[in-house]
């Protein structure tokens, strides 16, 4: 069963931290998390701009900045998880080039999962979520502002590749820990240009042919990989707007307390998922739903 036992959580002392921590507190058991490294990355140990004045007043001027930051993070973590948190964790305040340090820590700690805010890891650091996604070698969870509810619905876009198999297996592992959670498979059927219907298969219902082909492919996908149909509510949508990311987002938004799990790479139309327009649109436009990218 897939789990994310060791995770690195990038925090930047902004309001986004609260949403990340509350999401993890609500869903740590669902995800199988055992150890968390809460990391704040600083180019140098000067007082971060995000730390408010009231927080600064709590400490004497000679109090080392890294200790101030560590205590602030400790307070926020305790507030989210409670004083007797079952999750084992450590707090690390690291000086150096944030982007390189983050990738280094992922490797050193053998992290199964990196958790970041939806758009940026650290305000002003130059580490965008997209940049980390391109280079981090582990699974990545993007948590948006207000995306911290307890997960009830898991939306898994599929293209029937091995990469989407990893995504559905992650969803099944979540469901095994929380049986009441629902898995919604989603395949967006790409349609040819409108004039294609006038010059190919006239009167044959080409949309129906494409939809039927997609369902046959799904049947083979389920059979070949020994998946349980009972656990997956499969959905097929036509890409009428020629916007796969938009269809995925709209579908997921219809499900209360939902998250999206996607494979890191797949075949058409997802063949450049992390490195092409679909992933970038997902990261940039989905502002209220957690997005988990599995490798």
Where are these regions (language model features)?
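Short, surface-exposed alpha-helical segments at coil->helix boundaries
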Residues: 63-75, 211-219
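A structural micro-motif
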Residues: 34, 87-89, 138, 181, ...
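A structural preference for short, hydrophobic beta-strand core positions in alpha/beta folds
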Residues: 38, 90-93, 142, 185, ...
């Amino acid at each position: 069963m897939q789990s994310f036992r060791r995770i690195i959580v990038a925090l930047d002392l902004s309001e986004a931290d609260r949403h990340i921590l509350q999401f993890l507190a609500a869903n740590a058991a669902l995800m199988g998390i055992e150890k968390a490294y809460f990391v704040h990355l600083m180019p140098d140990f000067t007082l971060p701009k995000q730390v408010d004045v009231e927080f600064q007043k709590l400490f004497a001027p000679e109090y080392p900045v890294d200790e101030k930051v560590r205590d602030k993070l400790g307070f926020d973590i305790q507030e989210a998880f409670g004083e007797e948190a079952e999750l084992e964790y450590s707090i690390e305040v690291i000086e150096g080039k944030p982007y390189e340090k983050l990738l280094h820590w992922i490797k050193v700690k053998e992290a199964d999962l990196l958790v970041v805010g939806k758009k940026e890891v650290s305000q002003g650091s130059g580490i965008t979520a997209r940049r980390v996604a391109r280079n981090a070698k582990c699974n990545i969870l993007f948590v948006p502002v207000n995306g911290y509810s307890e997960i009830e619905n898991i939306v898994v876009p599929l293209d029937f590749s091995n990469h989407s198999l990893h995504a559905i297996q992650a969803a099944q592992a979540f469901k095994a820990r929380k049986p009441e959670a629902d898995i919604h498979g989603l395949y967006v059927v790409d349609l040819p240009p409108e004039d294609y219907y006038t010059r190919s298969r006239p009167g044959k219902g080409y949309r129906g042919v494409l939809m039927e082909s997609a369902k046959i492919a799904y049947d083979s996908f389920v059979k070949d990989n020994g998946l349980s149909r009972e656990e997956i509510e499969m959905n097929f949508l036509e890409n009428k707007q020629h916007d796969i990311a938009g269809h995925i987002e709209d579908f997921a938004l219809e499900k209360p307390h939902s998250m999206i799990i996607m494979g890191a790479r797949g075949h058409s139309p997802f063949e450049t998922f992390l490195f092409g327009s679909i992933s970038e649109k997902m990261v940039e436009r989905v502002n209220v739903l957690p997005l988990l990218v599995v490798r």
